[in-house]
Regions:
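A short, polar/charged loop-to-alpha-helix boundary motif
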Residues: 115-129, 262-280
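CN hydrolase (nitrilase-like) catalytic-core segments centered on the catalytic cysteine
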Residues: 66-84, 139, 149-265
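Active-site beta-strand/loop signature of hydrolases that rely on acidic residues for catalysis
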Residues: 3, 18, 26-56, 78, ...
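Cysteine/selenocysteine-centered motifs that mediate thiol-based redox chemistry or coordinate metal-sulfur cofactors
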Residues: 141-163, 167-169, 274-314
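Hydrophobic "anchor" residues
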Residues: 109-110, 254
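A charged helix-plus-loop insertion that forms the helical arch/lid used to bind
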Residues: 52-67
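Active-site-proximal beta-strand elements of phosphoester/diester hydrolases
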Residues: 1-12, 100, 112-115, 132, ...
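Short beta-strand scaffold segments in enzyme catalytic cores
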Residues: 87-89, 100-103, 131, 245-247, ...
């Protein structure tokens, strides 16, 4: 199977524009032989700007799934190109609002996952279910951004049978207590055509890609799964994001990665033979859950708030 991952610079709240870019990149992926395409977290609506929305504004941005206009448009695009598409949006249902990621085909919505650890807006409700579904002969899972940082989520999704995990993100280039993490100054982006090397050093350094590579390949390797990582490029809200959408195999190797500063895609062929030959597959079979069943099940109060969203830093 040939899978495509995308990156693009979204416009805040402009679902028509964002869907037009999704259609353009899906056409590009189709023309280059991809069997499906995956976009980033809340690609249909944009993400970071929602941190400042009140309940009324967030509710107005949200749509129902599958009846909402954006989902129906995504289905139309998928049907016209005969290609599954995965993308994120803000969903509303029965008075609750979710950070949601969907997979659509010409038949309609075949999978829906709600972010387990939303933090960008206090009015978002966490999802409470994992998602593993069949797509083109593969068992696929979805974990949105921060969900992937909680390693139990990845292991649980793999244990439910996932062979390929879609990992839509809006991440990188934000401050942290970790040395080297910070925002990227906007002048680098403004000068990206005159001085692309300086911007690439910012995006690929500890603020962006180097941070990703500390943990992202390990999620694939430890669990013996493929990872389809997606991330916007350029501005999402007031923050620059480094893109670097990539496909990682069960050995933890990057198969392909987007290195441009443009709206773009990359495609890789994934094969099932690597899964059962991987270390992660063997490690899952070697588990002794009787040793840690009660440890993992202990009561715990979850705190998801990242440092860059806290108002009182030390």
């Amino acid at each position: 199977m040939n899978i495509a991952v995308a990156q693009f610079e979204p416009k805040d709240g402009d679902t028509s524009y964002n869907l037009s870019v999704i259609e353009k990149l899906t056409k590009k992926a189709k023309s280059k032989g991809a069997d499906l395409i995956s976009f980033h977290e809340m690609a249909i609506t944009a993400y970071t700007f929602t941190k400042d929305l009140n309940l009324k504004e967030l509710t107005e941005l949200a749509e129902t799934v599958p009846a909402g206009k954006s989902t129906q448009e995504l289905i139309r695009i998928s049907k016209s190109l005969d290609m599954p598409i995965l993308a994120g949006l803000v969903e509303k249902e029965q008075g609750k609002i979710f950070n949601t990621y969907i997979c659509v085909t010409k038949e309609g919505v075949i999978a829906k996952f709600r972010k387990l650890h939303p933090f960008i807006n206090k009015h978002l409700t966490p999802g409470n279910e994992y998602c593993v579904f069949d797509l083109l002969g593969w068992k696929c899972g979805i974990l949105i951004c921060y969900d992937n940082n909680v390693i139990e989520n990845v292991r649980a999704t793999a244990l439910l049978g996932a062979e390929l995990i879609f990992a839509p993100h809006v991440t990188g280039c934000t401050p942290s207590k970790m040395p080297g993490r910070d925002y990227v100054d906007g002048t680098y982006w403004e000068n990206r055509f005159k001085d692309p090397v300086s911007l690439r050093l910012q995006f690929d350094g500890p603020k962006g890609r180097r941070w990703l590579m500390r943990w992202l390949p390990a999620r694939a390797y430890d669990n013996g799964v493929y990872y389809a990582f997606t991330n916007p490029i350029g501005y999402d809200g007031e923050h620059l994001k480094n893109g670097n959408s990539m496909i990682i195999d069960p050995y933890g190797e990057v198969l392909s990665e987007i290195k441009s500063f443009e709206d773009d895609i990359t495609i890789s062929k994934v094969t099932k033979d690597k899964i059962k030959w991987s270390g992660g597959w063997r490690y899952k079979n070697a588990r002794r859950p009787e040793l840690y069943r009660t440890i993992l099940g202990k009561e715990h109060s979850s705190d998801t708030t990242p440092i860059w969203l806290t108002s009182n830093e030390d």
